[in-house]
Amino acid sequence: MAKEWGYASHNGPDHWHELFPNAKGENQSPVELHTKDIRHDPSLQPWSVSYDGGSAKTILNNGKTCRVVFDDTYDRSMLRGGPLPGPYRLRQFHLHWGSSDDHGSEHTVDGVKYAAELHLVHWNPKYNTFKEALKQRDGIAVIGIFLKIGHENGEFQIFLDALDKIKTKGKEAPFTKFDPSCLFPACRDYWTYQGSFTTPPCEECIVWLLLKEPMTVSSDQMAKLRSLLSSAENEPPVPLVSNWRPPQPINNRVVRASFK
C-alpha cells in the first residue's frame, strides 16, 4: 500500500481507497456531465462573490498542485447565492492539469476534457472552523472553472509569474493583492451537484458550482504550469503533471443547471 497518495500507478486514484475509504463513497467527485440528462432548475439563484484581493496571502507548491491561500479568519472574501444556503468564505484556490493540452480537467462535459480545471474552495462559517465544515454535507462550496486553449490570459499570467518562486515541492512565497474573480468568465451559468474533494481524504462535503463557460489560456501558459516540479529542490527533477482524478460514478445524484 502506498505510504503517501499521489497520481502514479502505484499510489494513484485506483489505490486511494486503501488509505482513504471515503474514496469509494457514493458521492465522489469529479463526475462526467451528460448535458442531455441535466435538467434546468428554475429555483437556482445567480451566484456572486465579493472578494478582497488583500486577503490573498501565499502561494505554495505542495508537490501535488500549486495553491494560493487566503486569510479566512473572518468574512473577508465571500461567495453567496446559487444553490448555497448562506455565505461561504474563500480559503484557497488550486488547479489540476494534464501532461499535454488535450486533457487535464477532472470533470468532463459530454466527453470533452479541458486542458485544466481551477477550483476555488470556500467553507461555511456557520460551522466555525474549516475542519468542522469538512464533516457537513453543506460545509464546503467549490467553484470549478475549466481552462481551454486559446488566446493568452493577462490575469492568469499574474498568477503564473509567481510560479518561478515555487518551482519545487515544499516552496512557499508571499502572493498578495490578487482577486481571483478577475479569472471568472463573463457568463455565470453553472451546473451544481453534491460531491466530494477530488483529493484524499475525499470528504463528501461539497456543493459544486461548475461554470459552463471556460476561461481561456494560451498553450504557452499551460506549458508554464507544467514547468512546476513535484520533486523537492535537492531531488532529481520530476515534472508536476497529470494531477487529476478521473470521473467517479454519479450513482443516484442529480446534476442541476441554472440555465435552459
UniProtKB/Swiss-Prot annotation:
Q: What is its main location?
A: cytoplasm
Which controlled-vocabulary keywords does the entry list? Acetylation, Cytoplasm, Glutathionylation, Lyase, Metal-binding, Phosphoprotein, Zinc
Tell me where it resides: Cytoplasm
InterPro entries attached to this UniProt entry: CA_dom, CA_dom_sf, Carbonic_anhydrase_a-class, Carbonic_anhydrase_a-class_CS
Q: Which residues carry this modification: S-glutathionyl cysteine?
A: C182, C187
Instruction: Please provide, in alphabetical order, the Gene Ontology terms of the cellular component aspect for this entry.
Output: cytoplasm; cytosol
> Per its UniProt entry, what is the enzyme's top EC class, as one word?
lyase
User: How's its activity regulated?
Assistant: Activated by proton donors such as imidazole and the dipeptide histidylhistidine. Inhibited by coumarins and sulfonamide derivatives such as acetazolamide.
Task: List, alphabetically, the PROSITE patterns matched.
Answer: ALPHA_CA_1 (PS00162), ALPHA_CA_2 (PS51144)
Instruction: Give all N-acetylalanine modified positions.
Output: A2
- GO MF term set: carbonate dehydratase activity; nickel cation binding; phosphatase activity; zinc ion binding
EC number(s) from the headed UniProt entry = 4.2.1.1
Reaction equations catalysed: hydrogencarbonate + H(+) = CO2 + H2O
Q: Which cofactor does it need?
A: Zn(2+)
Q: Which residues carry this modification: Phosphothreonine?
A: T73, T129, T176, T216
Sites where Phosphotyrosine occurs are at: Y127
Looking up SMART domains in the UniProt record yields:
Carb_anhydrase
| UniProt PTM | S-thiolated both by thiol-disulfide exchange with glutathione disulfide and by oxyradical-initiated S-thiolation with reduced glutathione.
Modified residue Phosphoserine is at which positions?
A: S29, S43, S48, S50, S55, S219
Q: CDD domains under this entry? A: alpha_CA_I_II_III_XIII
Look up what happens after changing F197L. Answer: Enhanced activity by at least 10-fold
| Keyword NAD tagged | no
Pfam families the UniProt entry points to: Carb_anhydrase (PF00194)
Function of the protein: Reversible hydration of carbon dioxide.
Q: Which family does it belong to?
A: Belongs to the alpha-carbonic anhydrase family.
Q: Please state what the protein is called.
A: Carbonic anhydrase 3
